[in-house]
């Protein structure tokens, strides 16, 4: 790691220049690497195989369309019979089956290319469905529709209408999954053949079931009206065929903390925090306190803040009291600041000059740089033959020489005295 810059103007300038010339630059200026994102989920092998077959079938359509259709029917029929099942066509189709970025498709095609060739030349007459022959029967990656799992078991509800047509059989068509039915809203049961909680049978026949919603708080009902409730949801009680809200705040059902109060809601309740002034409360605000918190006092029916600053609570010179909600704090008076537990008068700092932090050696270097620039400029003008600038140049050189000699003699004398 590069060192931090030294103090002082000139050393800092030289440090920055050295960093600029000594590449690469300081490492803290390099951008941090982007956060690592989790890899996307891999598709089920059956889905990859289905995609490969779908792309293969599209390739068959494309090759027929691209190679024939010129209008000469007799010529097309003669040549189509040769091209239809040719190796040339197979190669053309396979070249476009997988996109460049679909790694899973390329991997599966590499593993199954010999099987595809076998089907193309020997099996497609007896097994025209490539998906069934390749993905289900040969590779055993997929199952027929309405079945699931390693043994291709029927989904609940049967293979014709898995999950009764009102849900999704988990793993259907693949060699995985549990076969569990994920039912649509309003439907339930093992094969989604019943109405779920909060719904009733509006219509049913041998092949059709319609489930409609009960009235809001009803868990079970015989119809859509409030009076059709048979059982109520949690937080409600059945009373004269209607569901009535239970006030949990008036029962032991509410479980709020010591510094909270209960608020009843439809079918439930909420616990809300007491006011800061309260130690326990029966409702919102400082007027519903059971007891007052420290720093508060009972005034009428409310717990109000005690102004501790009315008494002498901040001993010490130049201190003053500041009242806060439920307490107070001692601060230094204006024009004073805290230092080691006492308040001392603030010293207004003198305004620092531009060169106030530079050392004597740094000032000498800066002066020499400045005079050097001036002399170079004057020398350039004097070289053009201007007598005025020539005189100024000679005078500046003489002045600089005298100044430098006097400064050097003072330093030599000072060093001699100090024994350097």
UniProtKB/Swiss-Prot annotation:
One of its GO terms (cellular component) is collagen-containing extracellular matrix. Its EC number is 5.3.4.1. FU repeats lie at residues 208-256, 268-315. It is an enzyme of class 5 (isomerase). GO terms for biological process: cardiac septum development; endocardial cushion development. Changing residue 391 to P: In JELANS; uncertain significance. Pfam families: DUF3456, EGF_CA. It is a multi-pass membrane protein. Residues 153-193, 305-344 form the EGF-like domain. The keyword Transmembrane applies. It is linked to Atrioventricular septal defect 2: A congenital heart malformation characterized by a common atrioventricular junction coexisting with deficient atrioventricular septation. The complete form involves underdevelopment of the lower part of the atrial septum and the upper part of the ventricular septum; the valve itself is also shared. A less severe form, known as ostium primum atrial septal defect, is characterized by separate atrioventricular valvar orifices despite a common junction. This is Protein disulfide isomerase CRELD1. The gene is CRELD1.
């Amino acid at each position: 790691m590069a060192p931090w810059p030294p103090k002082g103007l000139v050393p800092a300038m030289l440090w920055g220049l050295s960093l600029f010339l000594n590449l690469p630059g300081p490492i803290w200026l390099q951008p941090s690497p982007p956060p690592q994102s989790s890899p996307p989920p891999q598709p089920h092998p059956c889905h990859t195989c289905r995609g490969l077959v779908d792309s293969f079938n599209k390739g068959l359509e494309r090759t027929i369309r691209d190679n024939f259709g010129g209008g000469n029917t007799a010529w097309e029929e003669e040549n189509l019979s040769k091209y239809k099942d040719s190796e040339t066509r197979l190669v053309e189709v396979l070249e476009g089956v997988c996109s460049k970025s679909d790694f899973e498709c390329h991997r599966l095609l590499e593993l199954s290319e010999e099987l595809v060739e076998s089907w193309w030349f020997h099996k497609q007459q007896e097994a025209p469905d490539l998906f069934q022959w390749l993905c289900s029967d040969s590779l055993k990656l997929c199952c027929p529709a309405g079945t699931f799992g390693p043994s291709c078991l029927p989904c609940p509800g049967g293979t014709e209408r898995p999950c009764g047509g009102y849900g999704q059989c988990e793993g259907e068509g693949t060699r995985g999954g549990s076969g569990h039915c994920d039912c649509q809203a309003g439907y339930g049961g093992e094969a989604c053949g019943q109405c779920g909680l909060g719904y009733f049978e509006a219509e049913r026949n041998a092949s059709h079931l319609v489930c409609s919603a009960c009235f809001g708080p009803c868990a079970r009902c015989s119809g859509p009206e409030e009076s059709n409730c048979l059982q109520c949801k949690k937080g409600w009680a059945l009373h004269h065929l209607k569901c009535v809200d239970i006030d949990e705040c008036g029962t032991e059902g509410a479980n709020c903390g010591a510094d909270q109060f209960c608020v009843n809601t439809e079918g439930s309740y909420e616990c809300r925090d007491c006011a800061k002034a309260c130690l326990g409360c029966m409702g919102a605000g400082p007027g519903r306190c059971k007891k007052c918190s420290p720093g508060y006092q009972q005034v009428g029916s409310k717990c109000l803040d005690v102004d501790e600053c009315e008494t002498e609570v901040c001993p010490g010179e130049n201190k003053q009291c500041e009242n806060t909600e439920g307490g107070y704090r001692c601060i230094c008076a204006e024009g004073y600041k805290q230092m080691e537990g006492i308040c001392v008068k603030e010293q207004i700092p003198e305004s620092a000059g531009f060169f106030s932090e530079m050392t004597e050696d740094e000032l000498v270097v800066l002066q020499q740089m400045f005079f050097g620039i001036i002399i170079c400029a004057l020398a350039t003008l004097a070289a053009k033959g201007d007598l005025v600038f020539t005189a100024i140049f000679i005078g500046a050189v003489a002045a600089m020489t005298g100044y430098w000699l006097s400064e050097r003699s003072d330093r030599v004398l000072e060093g001699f005295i100090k024994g350097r």
